[in-house]
Amino acid sequence: MTIYHFVGIKGSGMSALAQILHDKGFQVQGSDVDKYFFTQKALEEKQIPIMTFSADNIQEGLTIIAGNAFPDTHEEIERALELGLSVIRYHKFLGQLIDGYTSIAITGSHGKTSTTGLLSHVVGAIRPTSYLIGDGTGSGTKDAEYFALEACEYQRHFLAYKPTYAIMTNIDWDHPDYFKSVDDVFNAFETLGKQVKKAVFALGDDAELRKLTLDIPIIYFGFGEENEFQAKNVIKETTGTKFDVYHREEFLSSFEIPAYGDHNVLNALSVIALCDYEGLPVEDVKNELKTFEGVKRRFSITEKGNQVLVDDYAHHPSEIRATVNAARQKYPDKKVVAVFQPHTFTRTRTFLQGFADSLNLADEVYLCDIFGSAREKTGNLTIADLAHKTKGNHIIKEEHTEELLKYPEAVILFMGAGDVQKFQAAYEKVLDHEFLTEADLKKSAIN
């Protein structure tokens, strides 16, 4: 029996794909760096072996699935090629895997992971569904009819897919190390659209997506009157958001989600539209929307005393803006403190003023050093260039997170696509020490 070996198994997509193959009964293993990543927890729970990168890991009989971050010169891939083993890139393997299902590719500059998670939750509760989510979660469900997958636009990798449906959440200029302009991004999305078999669900409030020209139906959703599926009468509460949905100006139903911000209404609306198109019962869809608990690293809340710590993947000005607004909806009486770690020097340089403008929507801003991606380790700017444009000109270090104790009633947003979680972990240790010290003082006073 073939053993699938994943080169870079801790990558979010790779981890999810490994879990899918494991669930389908295949033997799976993989390798990566020794550093801990949140994606490996699910792998460990399923007892999928994780090794440290080494050419010695590559033996006869393996089929190699290579992560897109690793070139053919990587020691394990080189050894595999020397042995004449089959080496296939992640996105190409996934493109082959989804054939035979009613596949739904969820793409967009922002909101892919949250929407894929929501769709998987809703459709999966109604019909057997396999799914691959960009937070490292994957499931190869037995006898699945549907396959929901997050489709990343970077380097046009999503062009390896020919899905039944696509959901396009928005188009924005991101990944400036690859895409040269928003027009370049649009061209990639339109090319994907031409590969979709049945229909594309697209945000009609997005000027770029309105330019799509395809031979299949484009079902537009959004807040605007011109959309086929429209969200109206939005009520924002501290417990979530309620809204009505109209289909071609006819009332469909009222919905409720335990999530915050306009972006989450739109994510839910895309799922509602697809489910309606597929004839899934609206009452079932309503019930499942109410129970979605979110995906990893997307507004993930930890309460510590009177402080609320939020872990979020936001790494683009538009995403930061959405996260700050969501925090203000859920916690209207709390101060919002942003702790942000920029991801890649190219993105930071390109959107420097945009980052400053969105971060300054928070009450206080703290910046971590720029996180260089695997493709880009250094740059000719520093975090000070961004700090000069933000409130307070604060730069925070992992070993000095106690500065955040100054905001005892605040919501603290730890945002970034790198390893900003280590700053939150360091601060939680500070808080735990503070709570212990306070408890000791009270105990001494009683005695």
Curated annotation (Swiss-Prot):
GO terms for molecular function: ATP binding; UDP-N-acetylmuramate-L-alanine ligase activity. Pathway: Cell wall biogenesis; peptidoglycan biosynthesis. It catalyses: UDP-N-acetyl-alpha-D-muramate + L-alanine + ATP = UDP-N-acetyl-alpha-D-muramoyl-L-alanine + ADP + phosphate + H(+). It is found in: Cytoplasm. GO terms for cellular component: cytoplasm. Keywords: ATP-binding, Cell cycle, Cell division, Cell shape, Cell wall biogenesis/degradation, Cytoplasm, Ligase, Nucleotide-binding, Peptidoglycan synthesis. It holds the Pfam family Mur_ligase_C. SUPFAM superfamilies: MurCD N-terminal domain (SSF51984), MurD-like peptide ligases, catalytic domain (SSF53623), MurD-like peptide ligases, peptide-binding domain (SSF53244). Gene3D superfamilies: Mur ligase, C-terminal domain (3.90.190.20), Mur-like, catalytic domain (3.40.1190.10), NAD(P)-binding Rossmann-like Domain (3.40.50.720). Its EC number is 6.3.2.8. Cell wall formation. Belongs to the MurCDEF family. This is UDP-N-acetylmuramate--L-alanine ligase. The lineage of its organism: Bacteria, Bacillati, Bacillota, Bacilli, Bacillales.
